[in-house]
Amino acid sequence: MPLEPSVRVVRELTSRGYNADREAVTLLAGADDPGAAVERAVAAAAADAATLTVSDVRAVLDAHTASSAAQTSAPASTPPDEATTHTDPSATDTPPNHDGGRAATADARSVEIDGDMTGASTGTGEYQDFVSVFRDRYDRLAAQLRGRVNHRPTSALASMPGGSDAAIVGMVNDIRSTTSGHWRVELEDTNGVFPVLVLKDRDVSDLVDDLLLDEVIAVSGTLADDGTILFADDIYFPEVPRTYSPSTADRSVQAALISDVHVGSQEFAADAWRSFADWLHTPAAESVEYLLIAGDMVEGVGVYPGQDEELDIVDIYDQYETFAEHLKDVPGDMEIVMIPGNHDAVRLAEPQPAFDEELRSIMRAHDARITSNPSTVTIDGVSVLLYHGVSLDEVIAEHPSDDVTYDDPQNAMELLLKKRHVAPPFGGRTRLAPEAEDHLAIDTVPDVFHTGHVHKLGVGIHHNVRLVNSGCWQHQTAFQESVNISPDVATAPILDLDTLDITVHKFS
């Protein structure tokens, strides 16, 4: 399949030891003769330059245009039939001006990143750090619940007369069933702990299955006659408002949502990746201007027992070098945003800061934006919450419903949206870092929630928020087979930013 001029430009520059700004690549690719334009830009580059800027390229192109204009007004010294023409054989089937599709809309794009905590980690592991993060979590989520119930602090409930109507906003400290089949839930606020009893024959008991430790909820009900326990009538989650109206783009533009590439694994689906990258160069994908990657760019090392036997590339830096080469197959004029995952070379505890400078430099050729896990990226006015998704393991394991499974990861994602937190339980399967503030709380409702990690495709809608778990690019490993994981390989959900419709493309 013929390569897009922007990709040929990037490869030509890389072969000569140069990087270039995205805008510079676009200018070079849009030249009448991209190959000759690269020659002139490299020849004019400063001796110590490693990256060509848009100013460098524009100066070269402007100078050439002025020179060509002068030659056109002078008598021709070379007969037309003797003029030298540079032709790239790979471009013979490329429609005229096809590369101008994305380049022509580059100025219309907008990318904003919120919640990036890279370089802002304050946790030291001291006791006060844990106090700070849980107090911040309580304050953030309680603020979303206080307008829905007439709550009282735990200290005030203890002094209220028995039989009174009451409500409390608290963090779930404990959940256990009684010998009679009822549920006893302990809620904690900044003043103390108060017990709640959920009777098994009440409708509200159906919500107990959705509860997770350390999430913040509100409960309304009636105090027992002795005032020592609250009988629950209703349970409230921070939730997404039912009337939530998501934002959309004001032009026809799309984003590809992928995750779990796992370069370095023997099971990396290299052929499928090439098919995906080739498709991005076709007219059918011309509207796909953004690529959002939700973690696990590489397979990593030492992630699980016996992983070394399943590695094709054993050095972690070599894995990222190879991933960067595969990323170059993607059109050079696409905007790329990525977050790390649990296989990437960052700390395991969440939130995960983005890659260090050494890894960033490896992936610099495509000028990808790299942010922390989780982060919210707003593209063309549409906010997308990117979270790798390790906590989905815990939600799926703890929830008794047959609807919350690995085969339907969007249902577990829906529960996280209800709780307005991407990883509520502390001390379980998901490692959480104590920080001065809770970076895992969902303060602002996103228009789209994109996760990965479980290697399964899932698409859904919750209160008008689109949910996408994007599958993976790794065939089943021996480890996955041992834990009965059958991955959805080479899937790329394509999000229409102007309608929020989602179309899944398969490249295996």
From Swiss-Prot:
Query: Which reaction equations make up its catalytic activity?
Result: DNA(n) + a 2'-deoxyribonucleoside 5'-triphosphate = DNA(n+1) + diphosphate; Exonucleolytic cleavage in the 3'- to 5'-direction to yield nucleoside 5'-phosphates
GO BP term (any one): DNA strand elongation involved in DNA replication
Query: Which residues fall in a compositionally biased region of kind Low complexity?
Result: 66-80
A Gene Ontology molecular function term for this protein is: DNA binding
According to the UniProt entry, what is the EC number of this protein? 2.7.7.7, 3.1.11.1
The record's region (Disordered) falls at 66-122
| Ribosomal protein in keyword set | no
Q: Does the keyword Nucleotidyltransferase apply?
A: yes
| Coiled-coil residue spans | none
Identify the InterPro entries for this entry: DNA_pol_a/d/e_bsu (IPR007185), DNA_pol_delta/II_ssu (IPR024826), Metallo-depent_PP-like (IPR029052), Pol2_small_arc (IPR011149)
According to the lineage, what is the superkingdom?
Archaea
Where in the sequence does UniProt note compositional bias of the Polar residues kind?
Answer: 86-95
**Keyword terms:** DNA replication, DNA-binding, DNA-directed DNA polymerase, Exonuclease, Hydrolase, Multifunctional enzyme, Nuclease, Nucleotidyltransferase, Transferase
One GO cellular component from the entry? DNA polymerase complex
- Stored CDD domains: MPP_DNA_pol_II_small_archeal_C, PolII_SU_OBF
Q: Which family does it belong to?
A: Belongs to the DNA polymerase delta/II small subunit family.
Q: Assembly state and interactors?
A: Heterodimer of a large subunit and a small subunit.
Database matches in PANTHER family: DNA POLYMERASE DELTA SUBUNIT 2
Role description: Possesses two activities: a DNA synthesis (polymerase) and an exonucleolytic activity that degrades single-stranded DNA in the 3' to 5' direction. Has a template-primer preference which is characteristic of a replicative DNA polymerase.
User: Under which name does UniProt file this protein?
Assistant: DNA polymerase II small subunit
Question: Taxonomic lineage per UniProt?
Answer: Archaea, Methanobacteriati, Methanobacteriota, Stenosarchaea group, Halobacteria
